[in-house]
Amino acid sequence: MSSQASQRSSSTSAVAQKTRERRKSKSRRRCWFGCLWLSSRVSLIRSSSRFSRSPEPDESLTAIDKVMSIINEKPLKMAHILKTARFVNDVSFSERKQFVECGVIHHLLELIGETAISDFSASSRSADEQKRRARRNSSASLSHKGTGYGTGSTRSRWDIERTVEEKLIREEHLTWLLSILNSFMLGWPTTDNLKTKPEELVHMTEIAIKLIADSSVLSILEYNLRNDSFFDVSEHIEIYQALLETAASMAATPGLVPFLVRPYTSSAKSIAKELIPRFKENILSIQARWGGTLEETNFRMAEFTAKVTLLSDYVINAARAYEQTLPPEQRIQTATHRRPSHSGLHSKMQGPKDDETIYKNKMQELQLQTAKFIGDFGKLCVPYVFRKEAKNINPFSPHLRDRTKRIAKELASIANALPLNASNSIYVCYDEGRVDIIKVLISGPDDTPYANGLFEFDIFFPTGYPFSPPKCAFLTTGSGNVRFNPNLYNDGKICLSILGTWEGRPEEKWNPYCSLMQVLVSIQGLIFVKDPYFNEPGFERYQGTDRGDEYSRKYNLQIEHATLNYAIREQLKKPSEHFKEVIEKHLWLKREAILKQAQAWIDNVSNDFGDDKMSKRKDVFAFETGFNPATQERVIHNLIQELQAMQSPFAKEEAEESERLKREQSEKEEKQKKEAAALAEIEREKRELELDFQRRRSSVLATHVAVIRTQPTGDYSVPSVNEPSTSS
């Protein structure tokens, strides 16, 4: 037993020994692998740290190598772009030639073209995407939805925040890429280097000039500087400042100035002579008018305005200096668009006197006007649909300051963006003390049943603006008796996806990046259309059929009468106080067209009701109201008589203009008389001098002859007429 026990114990100890050895071996292996893993991890961390610092300047690398290593990265990081601008700026002008020779500038210009957000970048959209858009926007698909009510599926997902964020990232990249280019051309910041002499820019060789001139830089400048929306510019100050700095950097190089002066395509405009002067004028005029509202803490905008003035003047002066070297026939003839001031209206009326030109010149100063909506003790003194909402808001509350500034920016922008022509126009009236209270007047477009009519709206910006849409109400309803459109109810409600009053696709709904201008254009373009009958969802099934066309024609006949009666006649008889001048002048300028329109309606109704079929009125529309041909025709005849008896609202202005012209003519004639009298006096004095000269000459000659006679011999000289004779 003892031997067996000893054998078992020895075998157990042997097993235990082997187990311990195996454990030690595993432990050693784990330690070895652990050390190997740790060392590899440390090396990876070190390499990653080196990479994270890259492309931190390596002392052994030149500036060219540093810049090349950065701009060749995929994707290009913002932090590295900032370093590149510093590297390029620190290099001397003579050393910058290497950037051109090594292809750095060529690659940089390609990156700028790829990053630019503009119309020409949209043209590179894939063919498949274009087909998808065409299918989505085709008339066939839209005709089955009801205009203005939204199209497509309401379940579609569209992340507006992500879209805007991506755009801002690209815009920031473009801003700094342009800054790198400016660092190369002139130096950065550009405003500190404007006094650099052209002969110092030795790196701007013919190759560098050709690279920049042939790149997308000119098209980017031309596209973005066309923008006259103050709201858009104020929201993207950095990119516009970079664009102006790029133009100034190019203007510092004499070889690039011609490309700023001459339009780069037949459809483009001169950057230096048209776009930049207009951009500067818009910014300065808006800042002067709205500075008190935009103000207070907005030093950023004030600084931007100062830079706009400095950089614009630099470019304009460079363009003028260049054109002084050209013969007059080779200089670029441009006509910079200018909004007229609020004085001297008729002095602006130069050029052809067609109806379109006359309408614009007469109505332009009335398009954006102010009025007093708030009376004593902060009470509204005009009719207003959203009176209760306006009363419950303290416009001077600190938490509404951003809302007020946003509204002011939008109003400043629409001054240059509102449509104005004889066919269709938009007029806006607001109170300078309460910019959240707005009244709008929209004229009906030609070739629609709303032609020449004037339709009034009340608009209010709620406290949640711009995160919630503005509130809009339609006022031209004939005291609730007429519904002008399936989208416009006789109680003033407006059905549009952008206003949140109807379901629509996410991209058709309101978002914080929408604006008042989009709402106004949507109302004008989506509601006041040629065939409003098909705006009603469900009626689209008749579109393209004989029955549908007949329904639409008869519906339009009723809308035309409502327009003539309520949007023209009632406006003429009882104009809104704040739009009275607009209404009177609009109707006077369009009276001939309205008379033809009224007579055409009478003829169409007479033709229709001469038909027995039509007189039975088998087809009745649910949304037709007050159909009475005899009464309606009588109303239109009254309108014709009232228009024919209408007195010109321009009579006072025309009398003043006539008086001014007479005064100018009288002053001109008086000036001519004075000039003629002065010339006559000069001629008289001239004749007197000539006679005096002749008398003196005769006297001298006579004296000389007398001397000769008394002295028979001797040599005598003839004295000068102007000199006194010694003998005399």
Swiss-Prot record:
What the entry lists under CDD domains is as follows: UBCc_BIRC6
Question: Basic and acidic residues composition bias: which ranges?
Answer: 658-678
- Please list the residues that make up the active site: 495
Region Disordered, residue ranges: 1-23, 123-155, 649-678, 709-728
Q: Where is the composition biased (Polar residues)?
A: 710-728
Q: Which GO terms describe its biological process?
A: negative regulation of apoptotic process
Q: Name one Pfam family in it.
A: UQ_con
* Residues covered by the UBC core domain: 402-568
Question: Where are the compositionally biased (Low complexity) regions?
Answer: 1-17
Q: GO molecular-function annotation terms? A: ligase activity; ubiquitin conjugating enzyme activity
The Swiss-Prot or TrEMBL record describes its family as follows: Belongs to the ubiquitin-conjugating enzyme family.
* Name by which UniProt lists this protein: Probable ubiquitin-conjugating enzyme protein 17
Organism name: Caenorhabditis elegans
Q: Which gene name belongs to this protein?
A: ubc-17
